[in-house]
Protein backbone atom coordinates (compact mmCIF):
# COMPACT_ATOMS: atom_id res chain seq x y z
CA UNK A 1 0.00 0.00 0.00
CA UNK A 2 1.30 3.43 -0.91
CA UNK A 3 2.22 5.51 2.13
CA UNK A 4 0.23 8.51 3.30
CA UNK A 5 1.68 11.26 5.49
CA UNK A 6 -0.12 14.06 7.31
CA UNK A 7 0.99 17.54 8.33
CA UNK A 8 -1.29 18.97 11.02
CA UNK A 9 -1.22 22.69 11.78
CA UNK A 10 -0.71 23.66 15.43
CA UNK A 11 -3.44 25.09 17.62
CA UNK A 12 -7.11 25.65 16.91
CA UNK A 13 -10.42 24.67 18.48
CA UNK A 14 -13.27 22.32 17.54
CA UNK A 15 -16.83 23.55 17.10
CA UNK A 16 -20.07 22.10 15.76
CA UNK A 17 -21.46 18.60 15.75
CA UNK A 18 -20.54 15.32 14.10
CA UNK A 19 -21.48 11.67 13.83
CA UNK A 20 -18.39 9.50 13.60
CA UNK A 21 -18.44 6.27 11.53
CA UNK A 22 -20.25 3.16 12.70
CA UNK A 23 -18.88 0.94 15.44
CA UNK A 24 -16.28 -1.46 14.09
CA UNK A 25 -16.93 -4.23 16.63
CA UNK A 26 -20.68 -4.22 16.01
CA UNK A 27 -20.27 -3.97 12.22
CA UNK A 28 -18.08 -7.10 12.12
CA UNK A 29 -20.48 -9.10 14.27
CA UNK A 30 -23.56 -8.00 12.33
CA UNK A 31 -22.07 -9.30 9.07
CA UNK A 32 -20.95 -12.58 10.67
CA UNK A 33 -24.23 -13.39 12.40
CA UNK A 34 -26.24 -12.19 9.40
CA UNK A 35 -24.37 -14.65 7.19
CA UNK A 36 -25.01 -17.52 9.63
CA UNK A 37 -28.69 -16.67 10.09
CA UNK A 38 -31.75 -18.01 8.35
CA UNK A 39 -33.23 -15.20 6.26
CA UNK A 40 -32.15 -11.68 5.42
CA UNK A 41 -30.35 -9.18 7.66
CA UNK A 42 -30.40 -5.46 6.88
CA UNK A 43 -27.56 -3.43 8.42
CA UNK A 44 -27.59 0.37 8.52
CA UNK A 45 -24.90 2.72 9.81
CA UNK A 46 -22.21 0.12 9.11
CA UNK A 47 -18.57 1.15 9.15
CA UNK A 48 -17.27 1.08 5.58
CA UNK A 49 -13.66 0.71 6.68
CA UNK A 50 -11.14 -1.76 5.31
CA UNK A 51 -11.43 -4.14 8.29
CA UNK A 52 -15.18 -4.61 7.95
CA UNK A 53 -14.94 -4.82 4.17
CA UNK A 54 -12.46 -7.68 4.70
CA UNK A 55 -15.06 -9.52 6.79
CA UNK A 56 -17.65 -9.02 4.04
CA UNK A 57 -15.16 -10.35 1.49
CA UNK A 58 -14.58 -13.48 3.60
CA UNK A 59 -18.28 -14.36 3.65
CA UNK A 60 -18.65 -13.73 -0.05
CA UNK A 61 -15.80 -16.23 -0.52
CA UNK A 62 -17.78 -18.65 1.68
CA UNK A 63 -20.78 -18.39 -0.66
CA UNK A 64 -22.90 -15.71 1.06
CA UNK A 65 -24.65 -13.10 -1.11
CA UNK A 66 -24.11 -9.62 0.34
CA UNK A 67 -25.41 -6.40 -1.22
CA UNK A 68 -23.57 -3.14 -0.53
CA UNK A 69 -22.21 -1.39 1.33
CA UNK A 70 -23.85 1.76 0.05
CA UNK A 71 -23.84 4.73 2.43
CA UNK A 72 -23.54 2.36 5.38
CA UNK A 73 -26.37 0.07 4.24
CA UNK A 74 -25.74 -3.65 3.71
CA UNK A 75 -28.10 -6.55 3.04
CA UNK A 76 -26.85 -10.01 4.02
CA UNK A 77 -28.73 -12.99 2.60
CA UNK A 78 -28.06 -15.54 5.32
CA UNK A 79 -27.42 -19.16 4.42
CA UNK A 80 -27.25 -20.76 7.87
CA UNK A 81 -24.26 -22.80 9.00
CA UNK A 82 -25.06 -25.53 6.47
CA UNK A 83 -25.08 -23.11 3.53
CA UNK A 84 -21.45 -22.00 3.84
CA UNK A 85 -19.26 -23.34 1.03
CA UNK A 86 -15.52 -24.18 0.88
CA UNK A 87 -13.61 -21.10 -0.33
CA UNK A 88 -11.49 -21.31 -3.46
CA UNK A 89 -8.67 -19.32 -1.84
CA UNK A 90 -7.12 -18.28 1.44
CA UNK A 91 -9.27 -15.90 3.48
CA UNK A 92 -7.30 -12.65 3.78
CA UNK A 93 -8.56 -10.31 6.52
CA UNK A 94 -5.95 -7.60 5.97
CA UNK A 95 -5.16 -5.77 9.22
CA UNK A 96 -8.23 -6.94 11.14
CA UNK A 97 -7.42 -8.79 14.35
CA UNK A 98 -11.13 -8.91 15.21
CA UNK A 99 -11.91 -10.70 11.94
CA UNK A 100 -9.12 -13.23 12.37
CA UNK A 101 -9.84 -14.17 15.98
CA UNK A 102 -13.63 -14.32 15.67
CA UNK A 103 -13.47 -16.19 12.37
CA UNK A 104 -11.10 -18.75 13.90
CA UNK A 105 -13.92 -19.73 16.24
CA UNK A 106 -16.62 -19.53 13.60
CA UNK A 107 -14.73 -21.60 11.02
CA UNK A 108 -13.51 -24.24 13.50
CA UNK A 109 -16.83 -26.10 13.42
CA UNK A 110 -17.24 -26.27 9.64
CA UNK A 111 -16.85 -29.51 7.66
CA UNK A 112 -14.15 -28.13 5.32
CA UNK A 113 -10.63 -26.71 5.58
CA UNK A 114 -9.90 -22.98 5.53
CA UNK A 115 -6.83 -20.76 5.84
CA UNK A 116 -6.97 -17.36 7.57
CA UNK A 117 -4.21 -14.88 6.79
CA UNK A 118 -3.63 -11.14 7.01
CA UNK A 119 -1.16 -8.40 6.28
CA UNK A 120 2.40 -8.36 7.64
CA UNK A 121 1.36 -6.56 10.83
CA UNK A 122 -1.51 -8.91 11.66
CA UNK A 123 0.55 -11.99 10.86
CA UNK A 124 2.94 -10.97 13.67
CA UNK A 125 0.23 -10.74 16.34
CA UNK A 126 -0.29 -13.56 18.89
CA UNK A 127 -3.00 -16.09 18.03
CA UNK A 128 -2.40 -18.93 20.51
CA UNK A 129 -4.64 -17.13 23.01
CA UNK A 130 -7.54 -18.12 20.74
CA UNK A 131 -6.28 -21.32 19.07
CA UNK A 132 -5.41 -23.06 22.37
CA UNK A 133 -8.89 -22.86 23.97
CA UNK A 134 -10.43 -23.77 20.61
CA UNK A 135 -8.21 -26.86 20.59
CA UNK A 136 -9.66 -27.77 24.00
CA UNK A 137 -13.05 -27.82 22.25
CA UNK A 138 -11.69 -30.24 19.63
CA UNK A 139 -10.72 -27.78 16.89
CA UNK A 140 -7.64 -28.53 14.81
CA UNK A 141 -5.84 -25.28 13.97
CA UNK A 142 -2.17 -24.96 13.09
CA UNK A 143 -0.19 -21.73 13.37
CA UNK A 144 3.36 -20.72 12.59
CA UNK A 145 6.04 -21.87 15.03
CA UNK A 146 5.70 -18.47 16.71
CA UNK A 147 1.97 -18.98 17.26
CA UNK A 148 0.98 -16.46 14.61
CA UNK A 149 -1.07 -16.52 11.39
CA UNK A 150 -1.62 -17.90 8.83
CA UNK A 151 -4.12 -20.09 10.69
CA UNK A 152 -4.79 -23.40 8.97
CA UNK A 153 -8.16 -24.64 10.19
CA UNK A 154 -8.76 -28.33 9.55
CA UNK A 155 -12.52 -28.82 9.27
CA UNK A 156 -14.64 -31.81 10.11
CA UNK A 157 -13.65 -32.19 13.76
CA UNK A 158 -16.62 -32.44 16.14
CA UNK A 159 -16.54 -29.72 18.79
CA UNK A 160 -17.52 -30.12 22.43
CA UNK A 161 -18.52 -27.30 24.74
CA UNK A 162 -16.11 -26.31 27.51
CA UNK A 163 -15.98 -24.21 30.67
CA UNK A 164 -13.11 -21.80 30.09
CA UNK A 165 -11.67 -19.05 32.26
CA UNK A 166 -9.88 -16.37 30.27
CA UNK A 167 -6.34 -15.80 31.60
CA UNK A 168 -6.49 -12.21 30.27
CA UNK A 169 -9.68 -10.24 29.67
CA UNK A 170 -10.33 -10.40 25.90
CA UNK A 171 -13.63 -9.83 24.12
CA UNK A 172 -12.15 -11.32 20.95
CA UNK A 173 -11.25 -14.63 22.59
CA UNK A 174 -14.58 -14.76 24.45
CA UNK A 175 -16.42 -14.15 21.19
CA UNK A 176 -14.43 -16.78 19.28
CA UNK A 177 -15.33 -19.41 21.88
CA UNK A 178 -19.01 -18.44 21.84
CA UNK A 179 -19.11 -18.62 18.03
CA UNK A 180 -17.48 -22.06 18.13
CA UNK A 181 -19.86 -23.02 20.93
CA UNK A 182 -22.83 -22.60 18.61
CA UNK A 183 -21.49 -25.58 16.61
CA UNK A 184 -20.41 -27.59 19.67
CA UNK A 185 -22.13 -30.37 21.58
CA UNK A 186 -23.39 -29.18 24.95
CA UNK A 187 -22.77 -25.93 26.77
CA UNK A 188 -19.89 -23.50 26.32
CA UNK A 189 -19.22 -21.16 29.24
CA UNK A 190 -16.59 -18.41 29.33
CA UNK A 191 -15.58 -16.68 32.57
CA UNK A 192 -13.89 -13.27 32.42
CA UNK A 193 -11.34 -11.93 34.93
CA UNK A 194 -12.67 -8.42 34.21
CA UNK A 195 -15.61 -7.12 32.14
CA UNK A 196 -15.05 -6.78 28.39
CA UNK A 197 -17.29 -5.52 25.60
CA UNK A 198 -20.41 -7.65 25.33
CA UNK A 199 -21.52 -6.92 21.76
CA UNK A 200 -21.42 -10.61 20.78
CA UNK A 201 -23.75 -11.67 23.59
CA UNK A 202 -26.18 -8.82 22.92
CA UNK A 203 -26.23 -9.47 19.19
CA UNK A 204 -26.65 -13.24 19.51
CA UNK A 205 -29.80 -12.55 21.51
CA UNK A 206 -30.90 -10.01 18.91
CA UNK A 207 -30.63 -12.78 16.28
CA UNK A 208 -32.74 -15.09 18.47
CA UNK A 209 -29.95 -17.19 20.02
CA UNK A 210 -30.33 -17.74 23.79
CA UNK A 211 -27.37 -16.59 25.91
CA UNK A 212 -27.20 -16.57 29.70
CA UNK A 213 -24.94 -14.59 32.04
CA UNK A 214 -24.22 -15.23 35.69
CA UNK A 215 -21.88 -12.60 37.14
CA UNK A 216 -18.61 -12.96 35.18
CA UNK A 217 -19.64 -16.08 33.22
CA UNK A 218 -21.49 -16.16 29.90
CA UNK A 219 -22.93 -19.43 28.54
CA UNK A 220 -24.73 -20.78 25.51
CA UNK A 221 -25.82 -24.19 24.27
CA UNK A 222 -24.84 -25.49 20.85
CA UNK A 223 -27.25 -26.34 18.07
CA UNK A 224 -29.69 -23.42 18.13
CA UNK A 225 -30.56 -21.27 15.10
CA UNK A 226 -29.99 -17.61 14.22
CA UNK A 227 -32.72 -15.60 12.48
CA UNK A 228 -32.15 -12.62 10.21
CA UNK A 229 -32.97 -9.22 11.67
CA UNK A 230 -32.26 -5.50 11.33
CA UNK A 231 -29.14 -3.94 12.87
CA UNK A 232 -28.66 -0.17 13.24
CA UNK A 233 -24.97 0.30 14.06
CA UNK A 234 -24.23 3.16 16.49
CA UNK A 235 -21.26 5.49 16.05
CA UNK A 236 -17.99 3.98 17.30
CA UNK A 237 -16.97 5.28 20.73
CA UNK A 238 -13.38 4.24 19.96
CA UNK A 239 -13.40 6.69 17.05
CA UNK A 240 -15.32 9.29 19.04
CA UNK A 241 -12.56 9.11 21.67
CA UNK A 242 -10.19 11.11 19.48
CA UNK A 243 -12.72 13.93 19.23
CA UNK A 244 -13.55 13.76 22.94
CA UNK A 245 -9.86 14.26 23.72
CA UNK A 246 -9.45 16.88 20.98
CA UNK A 247 -12.27 19.08 22.28
CA UNK A 248 -11.09 18.59 25.87
CA UNK A 249 -7.53 19.79 25.25
CA UNK A 250 -8.19 22.61 22.72
CA UNK A 251 -9.17 25.83 24.54
CA UNK A 252 -12.50 27.26 23.44
CA UNK A 253 -13.83 24.00 21.97
CA UNK A 254 -17.52 23.03 22.13
CA UNK A 255 -18.43 19.86 20.22
CA UNK A 256 -21.51 17.62 20.07
CA UNK A 257 -21.19 13.98 18.98
CA UNK A 258 -24.37 12.22 17.84
CA UNK A 259 -25.60 8.60 18.25
CA UNK A 260 -22.42 7.37 19.98
CA UNK A 261 -22.44 3.77 21.18
CA UNK A 262 -22.96 3.95 24.95
CA UNK A 263 -22.52 0.29 25.85
CA UNK A 264 -21.36 0.20 29.50
CA UNK A 265 -18.55 -2.20 28.58
CA UNK A 266 -17.11 0.48 26.26
CA UNK A 267 -17.43 3.72 28.24
CA UNK A 268 -14.18 3.40 30.17
CA UNK A 269 -12.65 6.17 28.06
CA UNK A 270 -15.32 8.65 29.18
CA UNK A 271 -14.95 7.59 32.82
CA UNK A 272 -11.17 8.09 32.65
CA UNK A 273 -11.50 11.49 30.96
CA UNK A 274 -14.07 12.62 33.53
CA UNK A 275 -11.72 11.58 36.35
CA UNK A 276 -9.11 13.79 34.65
CA UNK A 277 -11.55 16.71 34.76
CA UNK A 278 -13.08 16.55 31.27
CA UNK A 279 -16.41 18.30 30.70
CA UNK A 280 -18.46 15.60 28.93
CA UNK A 281 -22.24 15.88 29.14
CA UNK A 282 -24.75 13.22 28.09
CA UNK A 283 -27.46 15.15 26.25
CA UNK A 284 -29.77 12.21 25.55
CA UNK A 285 -29.80 8.41 25.52
CA UNK A 286 -31.68 5.76 23.56
CA UNK A 287 -31.47 2.05 22.80
CA UNK A 288 -31.21 0.72 19.26
CA UNK A 289 -31.25 -3.02 18.61
CA UNK A 290 -30.21 -3.85 22.16
CA UNK A 291 -27.30 -1.37 22.13
CA UNK A 292 -27.47 1.88 24.13
CA UNK A 293 -26.58 5.11 22.28
CA UNK A 294 -26.06 8.68 23.46
CA UNK A 295 -25.54 12.22 22.21
CA UNK A 296 -22.50 13.73 23.94
CA UNK A 297 -21.41 17.34 24.37
CA UNK A 298 -17.75 17.97 25.20
CA UNK A 299 -16.22 21.33 26.05
CA UNK A 300 -12.61 22.24 26.69
CA UNK A 301 -11.44 21.78 30.27
CA UNK A 302 -8.28 21.89 32.35
CA UNK A 303 -7.26 18.24 32.65
CA UNK A 304 -5.22 16.83 35.53
CA UNK A 305 -3.09 13.70 35.69
CA UNK A 306 -4.42 10.65 37.52
CA UNK A 307 -3.54 7.06 38.36
CA UNK A 308 -5.81 5.15 35.97
CA UNK A 309 -7.66 2.37 37.86
CA UNK A 310 -6.73 -1.04 36.50
CA UNK A 311 -10.37 -2.14 36.47
CA UNK A 312 -11.05 0.48 33.79
CA UNK A 313 -8.25 -0.72 31.49
CA UNK A 314 -10.23 -3.48 29.66
CA UNK A 315 -13.11 -1.01 29.20
CA UNK A 316 -10.85 1.45 27.35
CA UNK A 317 -8.19 -0.79 25.82
CA UNK A 318 -8.52 0.60 22.28
CA UNK A 319 -8.71 4.23 23.39
CA UNK A 320 -5.35 4.55 25.14
CA UNK A 321 -3.52 6.24 22.24
CA UNK A 322 -6.04 9.09 22.55
CA UNK A 323 -5.84 9.01 26.35
CA UNK A 324 -2.04 9.29 26.19
CA UNK A 325 -2.51 12.62 24.39
CA UNK A 326 -4.92 13.76 27.11
CA UNK A 327 -2.32 12.80 29.72
CA UNK A 328 0.41 14.71 27.85
CA UNK A 329 -1.75 17.86 28.03
CA UNK A 330 -2.87 17.42 31.65
CA UNK A 331 -1.43 19.12 34.70
CA UNK A 332 0.69 16.69 36.68
CA UNK A 333 1.46 13.03 36.21
CA UNK A 334 -0.62 10.19 34.77
CA UNK A 335 0.18 6.58 35.66
CA UNK A 336 -1.09 3.55 33.72
CA UNK A 337 -0.53 -0.07 34.83
CA UNK A 338 -2.14 -3.39 33.94
CA UNK A 339 -2.16 -2.62 30.21
CA UNK A 340 0.39 -5.08 28.79
CA UNK A 341 -2.19 -5.90 26.07
CA UNK A 342 -1.25 -2.58 24.43
CA UNK A 343 2.09 -4.10 23.40
CA UNK A 344 0.43 -6.62 21.05
CA UNK A 345 -2.06 -4.39 19.24
CA UNK A 346 -1.55 -3.20 15.63
CA UNK A 347 1.74 -1.89 16.99
CA UNK A 348 3.43 -1.90 20.40
CA UNK A 349 1.29 1.05 21.45
CA UNK A 350 3.21 1.69 24.66
CA UNK A 351 6.55 1.95 22.86
CA UNK A 352 5.26 3.78 19.77
CA UNK A 353 3.24 6.37 21.71
CA UNK A 354 6.17 6.94 24.09
CA UNK A 355 8.52 7.45 21.15
CA UNK A 356 6.18 9.95 19.50
CA UNK A 357 5.43 11.89 22.68
CA UNK A 358 9.14 12.17 23.43
CA UNK A 359 9.60 13.63 19.94
CA UNK A 360 7.05 16.30 20.92
CA UNK A 361 9.03 17.05 24.09
CA UNK A 362 6.91 15.17 26.62
CA UNK A 363 8.45 13.34 29.58
CA UNK A 364 7.37 9.70 29.20
CA UNK A 365 8.51 6.59 31.05
CA UNK A 366 7.32 3.42 29.31
CA UNK A 367 6.89 0.33 31.48
CA UNK A 368 6.23 -3.30 30.69
CA UNK A 369 2.51 -3.03 31.39
CA UNK A 370 1.91 0.69 31.14
CA UNK A 371 3.43 4.15 31.17
CA UNK A 372 4.12 7.27 33.23
CA UNK A 373 3.41 10.57 31.46
CA UNK A 374 4.18 14.04 32.83
CA UNK A 375 1.83 16.58 31.29
CA UNK A 376 2.81 20.03 30.08
CA UNK A 377 0.92 23.14 28.91
CA UNK A 378 2.30 23.20 25.36
CA UNK A 379 3.67 20.39 23.19
CA UNK A 380 6.45 20.75 20.67
CA UNK A 381 6.05 20.01 17.01
CA UNK A 382 7.95 17.38 15.09
CA UNK A 383 7.81 14.32 12.89
CA UNK A 384 6.43 11.10 14.35
CA UNK A 385 5.86 7.66 12.85
CA UNK A 386 2.56 5.83 13.33
CA UNK A 387 4.09 2.43 12.48
CA UNK A 388 0.99 2.05 10.22
CA UNK A 389 -1.23 1.91 13.34
CA UNK A 390 -4.46 3.81 12.64
CA UNK A 391 -5.05 4.80 16.26
CA UNK A 392 -1.49 6.13 16.67
CA UNK A 393 -1.90 8.31 13.57
CA UNK A 394 -5.19 9.78 14.77
CA UNK A 395 -3.85 10.37 18.28
CA UNK A 396 -0.94 12.49 17.07
CA UNK A 397 -3.21 14.44 14.72
CA UNK A 398 -5.19 15.47 17.81
CA UNK A 399 -1.98 16.34 19.69
CA UNK A 400 -1.33 19.18 17.23
CA UNK A 401 -4.15 21.15 18.88
CA UNK A 402 -1.78 21.84 21.80
CA UNK A 403 1.46 22.03 19.81
CA UNK A 404 3.54 25.15 19.12
CA UNK A 405 4.61 23.89 15.68
CA UNK A 406 3.19 21.51 13.05
CA UNK A 407 3.01 17.79 13.80
CA UNK A 408 3.97 15.57 10.86
CA UNK A 409 2.78 11.96 10.96
CA UNK A 410 4.13 9.20 8.74
CA UNK A 411 2.26 6.11 7.46
CA UNK A 412 -1.36 7.14 8.09
CA UNK A 413 -2.93 4.99 5.35
CA UNK A 414 -4.46 2.46 7.79
CA UNK A 415 -6.76 5.09 9.29
CA UNK A 416 -9.19 3.93 6.60
CA UNK A 417 -9.61 0.65 8.54
CA UNK A 418 -11.61 2.32 11.30
CA UNK A 419 -12.31 5.97 10.46
CA UNK A 420 -12.80 6.74 6.78
CA UNK A 421 -13.26 10.48 6.38
CA UNK A 422 -11.22 11.36 9.49
CA UNK A 423 -9.19 14.08 7.78
CA UNK A 424 -12.25 15.66 6.18
CA UNK A 425 -14.05 15.71 9.53
CA UNK A 426 -11.11 17.38 11.29
CA UNK A 427 -11.04 20.03 8.59
CA UNK A 428 -14.79 20.62 8.88
CA UNK A 429 -14.52 21.01 12.65
CA UNK A 430 -11.75 23.59 12.37
CA UNK A 431 -8.35 21.86 12.10
CA UNK A 432 -5.75 22.30 9.39
CA UNK A 433 -4.55 19.00 7.91
CA UNK A 434 -2.44 18.57 4.78
CA UNK A 435 -2.10 15.12 3.21
CA UNK A 436 0.76 13.77 1.12
CA UNK A 437 -0.12 10.45 -0.50
CA UNK A 438 -3.15 8.56 -1.85
CA UNK A 439 -5.72 10.39 0.28
CA UNK A 440 -7.20 12.19 -2.71
CA UNK A 441 -8.62 8.83 -3.85
CA UNK A 442 -11.05 9.09 -0.95
CA UNK A 443 -9.50 6.41 1.21
CA UNK A 444 -8.40 8.21 4.35
Curated annotation (Swiss-Prot):
It holds the Pfam family EPSP_synthase. PROSITE patterns: EPSP_SYNTHASE_1, EPSP_SYNTHASE_2. Keywords: Amino-acid biosynthesis, Aromatic amino acid biosynthesis, Cytoplasm, Transferase. Transmembrane segments: none annotated. GO terms for cellular component: cytoplasm. It catalyses: 3-phosphoshikimate + phosphoenolpyruvate = 5-O-(1-carboxyvinyl)-3-phosphoshikimate + phosphate. It is an enzyme of class 2 (transferase). 3-phosphoshikimate binds at residues 24-25, 29, 170, 172, 318, 345. GO terms for molecular function: 3-phosphoshikimate 1-carboxyvinyltransferase activity. HAMAP family: EPSP_synth. This is 3-phosphoshikimate 1-carboxyvinyltransferase. It comes from Halorhodospira halophila (strain DSM 244 / SL1) (Ectothiorhodospira halophila (strain DSM 244 / SL1)). The gene is aroA.
Amino acid sequence: MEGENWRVAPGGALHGEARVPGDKSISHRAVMLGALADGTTRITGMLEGADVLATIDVFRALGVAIEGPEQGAVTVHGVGWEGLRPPARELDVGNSGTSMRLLAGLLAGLPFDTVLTGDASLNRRPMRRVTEPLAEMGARITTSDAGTAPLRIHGGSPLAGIDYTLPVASAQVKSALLLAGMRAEGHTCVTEPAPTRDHTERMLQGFGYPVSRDLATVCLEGGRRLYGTGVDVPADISSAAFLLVAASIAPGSDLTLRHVGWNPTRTGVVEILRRMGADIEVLSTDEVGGEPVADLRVRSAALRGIAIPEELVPLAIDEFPALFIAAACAEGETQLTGAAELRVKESDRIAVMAEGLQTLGVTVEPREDGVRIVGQPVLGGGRVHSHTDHRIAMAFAVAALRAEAPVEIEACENVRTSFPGFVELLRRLGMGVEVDGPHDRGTA
